[in-house]
């Protein structure tokens, strides 16, 4: 228990130091794990990567926007530390540091505007112009009295099976989230992704409805086709219910043998993202509708991120 408390304290202080001293940093908790991880670098070491470029054999942390070409793709070329290994002295941490200010002017949609956008997409689906589109909405709130670190740990406690993350890119902003969807995971033997779709209250006893099963099958078929179009044969696992806080989703694991994908990680990621779970289907048509209907830029919301 003492070790866990120490790691939480150290990581909270490190997050505060990143914000106060305005240097790039990230923190995360892997799905189903208890430990926390951290990494940081000097601003001039933060790498901006061109589209299609991916550091396959370099340790660090990757942070990409929802739509390629719209915003920079960042890579933190650092050794990832466990939270209990953090040195606050090395981060020039001082308690009560003043946070660096970043002025953000979001464009919020009223509920009426959002409802109109939903109806526009539903009409397009009714005309069979697209099969699925995922709409997002921005809501600006007063900053909570809790710190970034406190919010990060609350998310980790609430969503134990999610990838929980916090990222600070000076001049760009801070991003915090908890996602149940793994875009790509490599264990040295296989590459694994998941088809995640269909939502209901967690713990429901009745069988999944036809609508949710069809929605999930769209994602499974999409990912399988992406792999086969690249000449890769997917291994499709058994469908199961995956809990995410107060809800659960249908999930099908899909994997590849690592050898068949050597040197093609950037190509595979680019083809997979955005999946129907965050964008829609067919991919390009759904993206066109999202650009047309939404009144804001998603920026890094719905993008992908994670350790290398």
Enumerate the language-model features and the residues they cover.
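Short, Gly/Pro- and small/polar-rich lid/capping loops
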Residues: 1-48
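An anion-binding catalytic pocket shared by soluble metabolic enzymes
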Residues: 20-33, 39, 142-218
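Non-catalytic accessory segments adjacent to catalytic cores
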Residues: 32-34, 40-143, 147, 230-232
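A residue-level signal for conserved active-site and pocket-lining positions in enzyme catalytic cores
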Residues: 62, 128, 184, 286, ...
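Contiguous alpha-helical scaffold segments within structured protein domains
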Residues: 82-112, 118-119, 142, 194-291
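Secondary-structure boundary elements
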Residues: 115, 123-131, 157-160, 169-172, ...
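A glycine-rich phosphate-binding loop feature that marks nucleotide/adenosyl-phosphate handling sites
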Residues: 169-173, 239-247, 304-308
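Glycine-rich, small/acidic residue-mixed loop/short-helix segments
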Residues: 283-284, 289-308
């Amino acid at each position: 228990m003492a070790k866990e408390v120490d790691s939480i304290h150290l990581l909270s202080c490190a997050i505060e130091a990143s914000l106060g001293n305005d240097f790039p940093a990230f923190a995360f908790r892997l799905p189903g794990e208890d430990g926390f991880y951290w990494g940081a670098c000097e601003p001039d070491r933060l790498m901006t990567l061109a589209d299609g470029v991916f550091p396959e054999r370099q340790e660090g942390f990757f942070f990409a926007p929802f739509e390629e070409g719209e915003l920079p793709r960042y890579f933190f070329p650092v050794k990832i530390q466990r939270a209990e290994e953090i040195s606050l002295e090395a981060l020039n941490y001082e308690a009560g540091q003043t946070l660096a200010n970043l002025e953000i002017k979001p464009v919020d949609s009223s509920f009426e505007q959002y409802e109109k956008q939903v109806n526009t997409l539903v009409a397009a689906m009714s005309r069979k112009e697209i099969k699925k589109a995922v709409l997002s909405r921005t809501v600006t709130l007063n900053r909570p009295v809790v710190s970034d670190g406190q919010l990060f740990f609350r998310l980790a406690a609430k969503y134990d099976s999610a990838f929980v993350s916090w990222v600070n890119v000076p001049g760009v902003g801070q991003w915090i989230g908890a996602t149940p969807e793994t875009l790509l995971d490599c264990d040295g033997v296989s590459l694994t992704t998941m088809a995640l779709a269909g939502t209901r209250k967690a713990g429901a006893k009745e069988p999944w409805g036809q609508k949710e099963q069809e929605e999930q099958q769209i994602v499974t078929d999409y990912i399988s086709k992406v792999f086969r179009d690249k000449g890769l044969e997917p291994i499709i696992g058994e469908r199961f219910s995956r809990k995410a806080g107060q809800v659960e989703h249908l999930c099908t694991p899909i994997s590849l043998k690592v050898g068949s994908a050597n040197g093609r990680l950037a190509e595979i990621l680019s083809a997979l993202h955005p999946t129907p779970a965050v964008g829609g289907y067919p991919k390009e048509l759904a993206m066109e509708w999202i650009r047309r209907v939404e009144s804001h830029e998603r920026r890094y919301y719905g993008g992908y991120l994670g350790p290398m």
